[in-house]
Amino acid sequence: MMRIERMHFEGAPGETVLVELTTPESALLARDGARLHEGERTLAQSFTAPARRDAFLAGRLAVHAGLANAGDSRAHRMPVLRDGRGRPQPSWADAPAISIAHTKIRAVAAVSTARTCKALGVDVEEIDAHRAEALLRMAISPEERKLLAEVDPQLVVAPIALWCAREACVKTHGLDVGWFGSVLQVSSIQPTPPRLTDAATGWDIEAAWNIEVRFESRAPMHAHAWQANGAVFALSGR
């Protein structure tokens, strides 16, 4: 199942197209993936693990849907490959900013509609109490834990939102930070109305937050995160 929506959020000019693709069975994914450019199919075959290959295909299908929705007429005939750091990158000049993330069961792609947007970062994680507990133990400071408890006393969803916000900011700003938990600090997490323009499209949003992230002496970075459909999503831009 594919959902396509547009949203505005702090830090990114214009609208951002957001695509969520619930990963179908491998056979169906391979069938749909056959429509991708040869260069993308070659990259997919470089993954020996079927799960990694399926995630790659789902991500490329999602980002092409986003590019088409954003009005980029080259998206149907040109591949989205990789840059020197392994990040997804359209192979044509003047392409919009994009980002891709995935879990075992879904892929998410973000595409900017504004040429002035320099970069986007999207992340997604499934909601899992064991994952939240591990993050609290290994990657979240006592100060951050207090902030999270104010918006999520059970500390199940907010820790994952914090992690996704960090990941989204790392992608947006091209940070090389190693172990994120020791260098990126969330300084604010504020409940907010969701930024999706139409909540009737099947997102089933339960909560949303604006999150401020700090790294060394940089200006504060911002991400918008939300809980929907059993997962947490986060988006950042500049």
Task: Give the label of every model feature segment.
Residues 1-238:
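Core catalytic alpha/beta fold that binds nucleotide/phospho-ligands
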